[in-house]
């Protein structure tokens, strides 16, 4: 599980939500996952197309992040569910 921070994945995920993650090293195009890119961790939708691989926010005010071969990139897992952080006693 991972606590969401920021508004880039609204309206589906909000700050304080807890995302449930299935640990795996690959996900399908269009799925939401947890990614490591150049020292930062992201919850984003993966877009793998003819113009490149991108991490895409659901909130349209954020631009897609292109992934280059020279980047340090890792897939941590697929987001399989969520709940409000307040629904989990003791989870901060």
Predicted features along the sequence, with ranges:
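Acidic/glycine-rich C-terminal interaction modules and beta/coil loop segments
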Residues: 1-92
């Amino acid at each position: 599980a991972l606590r969401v921070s920021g508004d880039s994945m609204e309206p589906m995920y909000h700050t304080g939500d807890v995302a449930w993650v299935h640990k795996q090293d690959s996900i399908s195009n269009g799925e939401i996952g947890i990614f490591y890119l150049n020292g930062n961790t992201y919850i984003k939708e993966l877009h793998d197309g003819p113009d490149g691989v991108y991490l895409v926010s659901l909130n349209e005010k954020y631009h897609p992040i292109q992934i280059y071969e020279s980047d340090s990139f890792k897939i941590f897992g697929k987001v399989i569910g969520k709940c409000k952080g307040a629904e989990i006693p003791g989870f901060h």
